Amino acid sequence: MNYATIKYYDIANGPGVRTSIFVSGCRHHCPGCFNEVAWDFGYGQPFDKAVRNEIFASCQPDYIAGISLLGGEPFEPENQRELLPFVRNFRALYPNKSVWCYSGYTWEQLTGKVPCPARCEVTDELLSLLDVLVDGRFVEAQHDISLRFRGSSNQRLLDVPKSLAAKAPVWWEDEQVFATHTM
């Protein structure tokens, strides 16, 4: 598996300060995609042991909230097979940090409720290691810059542990409180 880029100290792709890994390879080809170069599975650099260790080291400070997996498409079967051991290791090293994943596939597709070409032998385990899944393809006609942590209004922020327990999609509830102050 290759990665297109890694963003350290990212604040756009999940709560808090995170390390975001943009994998290469995507078959969705959403019109208006912000990362078209990552559609190509051969784009970027190999996701080798040195890179994985660099990511693990970047997450050591207490102020790092976790990692986010983006793309490209993390749930393309080729990428899932490489990401699973990485996420397992991340969970072992940092059990109190979160793992977010952005996928053009929907919850219903990834859990096998509807047909999905991306489901493979590791899908269920990889899904079980996530805290939040931002699901659904980017839809340019539904693009909304006011949405937090997603690009179009069809996309959902799903609490994966609660969704797995309920056997149905459960929206992630943002604990962040925003307030304005006047004098």
Question: What would you call each of these model-derived segments?
Answer:
Residues 1-22, 31, 35-42, 169-174:
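N-terminal [4Fe-4S]-dependent radical SAM core
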Residues 1-3, 17, 35-116, 121, ...:
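Conserved Radical SAM active-site core
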Residues 28:
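Glycine-centered loop/turn positions within well-structured domains
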Residues 76, 141-142:
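Short glycine-rich, flexible loops that bind phosphorylated cofactors or substrates
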Residues 86-91, 143-183:
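P-loop/Walker A phosphate-binding loop and immediately adjacent motor/lid segment at beta-alpha junctions
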Residues 125-128, 151:
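Short, conserved loop/helix-junction motifs that constitute active-site signature segments
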Residues 131:
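Receiver (REC) domain switch/active-site residues of two-component response regulators
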